[in-house]
Amino acid sequence: MRKPRVTLRHLAWSTMLLMVLGTGMLFWSAVRQQESTLAIRSIHQGASMPDGFSIWHHLDAHGIRFKSITPENDTLLITFDSSAQSAAAKAVLDKTLPRGYIIAQRENASQAVQWLSRLRDAPHRMG
């Protein structure tokens, strides 16, 4: 009985197949992440953030669902399942919140992108 030999051609095709599958999995994970976040902060430093309950009330009155409302430093972060919900919430909050607040879309970078930006922005000293 003959043993099958692994040739260079088989090894190359196997490696290429694994690379294509790995790239496809990375692409799929990036595409499926649809989460979107709004950040609300005051224009004037030291001014208070809007109350999370009032934000919830305004969004619920317009039928807009959200995942979470979280305070972070001097900013209130509202997380949504999709960018469409986030855009609708921004339109509602622009009308209902008093003047003096900035409502902006916040980028939700993946963990890999966050690590790459940390490495890129960190000062490197060689030599």
Curated annotation (Swiss-Prot):
Q: Name one GO molecular function term.
A: protein kinase binding
Subcellular location(s) per record: Cell inner membrane
Q: Could you name the Gene Ontology cellular component terms for this entry?
A: plasma membrane
Q: Where is the chain membrane-spanning? A: 12-31
The residues exposed to the Periplasmic compartment are 32-127
- Write down a Pfam family by its short name: SecD-TM1
Classification via Gene3D superfamilies: 3.30.70.260
In the UniProt record, the signal sequence range is none
Q: What is its main location?
A: membrane
Q: Which regions face the Cytoplasmic side of the membrane?
A: 1-11
The answer, when asked if Chaperone is one of the entry's keywords, is no
Q: How does it sit in the membrane?
A: Single-pass membrane protein
Q: Which residues form a coiled coil?
A: none
Q: Which UniProt keywords apply?
A: Cell inner membrane, Cell membrane, Membrane, Transmembrane, Transmembrane helix
Record family assignment:
Belongs to the MzrA family.
Show the HAMAP family listed in the entry: Modulator_MzrA
Subunit composition?
Answer: Interacts with EnvZ.
Q: What does this protein do?
A: Modulates the activity of the EnvZ/OmpR two-component regulatory system, probably by directly modulating EnvZ enzymatic activity and increasing stability of phosphorylated OmpR.
**Protein name from the UniProt record:** Modulator protein MzrA
